Amino acid sequence: MARFAAADGITHVVCTPHANGQYEFQPWLIAEKIADLQRLLETEKIALKLGHGCDFHLSYENIQEAKSAPSRFSINGHGYLLVEIPDYGLPPGLTDIFYQLQMVGLTPILTHPERNPTLQADQPRMMEWLRRGVLVQVTAGSVMGRMGKQAERMAHALLANRWVHFLATDAHNVTSRAPKMRDAFELVAKKYGPDYARLLCVSNPLAAFMGNPLPPQIEPLRLYEDSEEKSWWARLTRR
C-alpha cells in the first residue's frame, strides 16, 4: 500500500485504525508499529511520511475518554479528530456531541458523510455543524463514482457548495480500496478549480497533519443567508 500511495503522488498518510470497541485501540502500540513501518519505508526509499489517528466512533466510552484525554484519538495528538458516523442513521444528539468535543480543544472532521443514507436524503442537516466549525472529509472513491451513485451525487453536491475541507483515500488494500488520490484531485481541479483541489488534497491535510490552523478557505455557498453572516465567515477563515 505504501508503494501504491507514493507512486500516486501521496506524501503523507495518517494511519487510522478503528476505535469502535470491536478492535483493541492502544495508541502506544499503534505508535510503535508506525515507527517500525516508517523505518522500513526509509530503508526501502519509499518517500512517505506516516502519522497516526483513528476512525473515532461515537460510543459513550470514546466520547468520555476523548474529553478527558483529547490527544488520545486525534491526528498526531494535535487536535483534529476523524469522526466516523454509522453506515445508517445518525447518533442522537450529534450536534451536542460535536460541541462537547470542541469544548476540550478538538476539531471534529466528519468523515465520508456522502456515504450515509440519512444525510444523502437530508444534506441541509449538515449546515449547522459546518456553521459551528465542524470540518468535512469526502472519500476520493465517492468523487470518482466508486462508492455508488448516491454517494457520488452527494460528494459533488458538497464540493459544489465548497462544504468539503479534505479528500481522503479511505484505503484498506491495493485492490478494491487502494490508496489513490490523483484521479480525484484532477477531477476536482477540473470541475471546481485548482485552488480548491489543492486546499482539499494538499494544504488542509498538511495543516491537520502538523496540527496547524487551516489556511484561508474558499467561502462556502448556501450556508449563510445574509451578508452579515457571510462577512463573519470571511473574518473567521482569514484569521
Locations of the language-model features?
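Non-catalytic positions within long, well-ordered alpha-helices that form the structural scaffold/packing
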Residues: 6, 102, 159-160
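Conserved short secondary-structure transition element at the edge of the structured enzyme core
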Residues: 138-140, 155-169
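Extended substrate/RNA-proximal surfaces in nucleic-acid metabolism proteins
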Residues: 25-137, 220-239
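Short beta-strand segments at enzyme active-site cores
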Residues: 11-17, 51-53
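Short acidic/histidine-rich active-site segments
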Residues: 16-18, 163-179
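Mid-to-C-terminal alpha-helical segments outside catalytic/metal-binding sites
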Residues: 186-239
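Histidine/acidic-residue-rich catalytic or RNA/ligand-binding cores of hydrolases
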Residues: 27, 120-127, 147-156, 160-161, ...
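Active-site environment of divalent metal-dependent phosphoester hydrolases
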Residues: 20-23, 57-59, 115-119, 143-146, ...
